[in-house]
Amino acid sequence: MSSEQIEVVVAGHICLDIIPTFQPRTTGSAEFLVPGTLVTVGPAHLSTGGPVSNTGLALHRLGVPTRLMGKVGADLFGEAVLNLLRAHDPRLAAGMIVDEHESTSYSIVISPPGVDRTFLHSPGANDTFRAADVDVRRVAGARLFHFGYPPLMREMYQHDGADLARLMRRVKDAGLTTSLDMAYPDPETEAGRADWARILEETLPYVDVFLPSLDELLLMLERETFDGLHAGEPVAAQIDGGALSRLAGRVLGMGAAVVGLKLGDQGLYLRT
């Protein structure tokens, strides 16, 4: 698959999802996974997760020539990720980076029937993915560059997002349309405390399509509003149309050409 044939490059976060299967239980969440007990589970389902695989494989299934650019470690989990990609098309793993000094990112998805899902996540090699890992020569000739989940990639949000802005600027200068997908950072972690307003101000001038969810954008730009939300209620149900317009307008003012605010089951708020 040569660079001349590629239409879309999808880069950023990728991980191995390990999903144990559970039998229905009569006990509730309070009795589940009690310390010192053994819980019998069924076979584990393995799949790739993150935007590199989710978006990239969806485009591939639609027949769009796509190159995937993510980073894994030289370990068993990394080989599993590569093999899962190769199962769709042997060429899909060609753009992946294998770093012998890093471990592969993985998530354990604990999802018993009738109990809210719990995720155990190790960022692994995603934390060291940087602008230099994207060879602009391998991007040139494509029409779209899609980057996903900088809040889950340490090099992308440290130093006020200098590496994220550098990456998007280089790709934009190469003549590609750019899109940026976000993820929800834990508010109590380094990612959640990062100066996202500053990061977006530096990055969005090089982004054509910006795709955050409503709760992600509130956390990043209006922390007081975010902290005042009622837990357990859909965020979109607590925010009126005026607030959506205000948030979208602020993002457009930072430089993005199009903003698509994801509203869960309420759909998408799109503004140019």
Locate the predicted segments by residue.
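Structural motif
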Residues: 9-10, 143-148, 179, 211, ...
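A short, aliphatic-rich alpha-helical micro-motif
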Residues: 3, 136-142, 201-204
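Conserved phosphate-binding/catalytic loop of the ribokinase/pfkB sugar-kinase fold
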Residues: 97-99, 109-157
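Glycine-rich phosphate/adenosyl-contacting loop at the front of the ribokinase-like
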Residues: 1-71, 76-90, 114
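Conserved phosphate/ATP/ADP-binding segment of small-molecule kinases
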Residues: 165, 172-177, 183-272
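A glycine-rich helix N-cap at a beta->alpha junction
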Residues: 84-102
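Hydrophobic beta-strand scaffold residues
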Residues: 66, 92, 178-179, 211
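Active-site metal-binding loops of divalent metal-dependent hydrolases
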Residues: 14, 150, 182
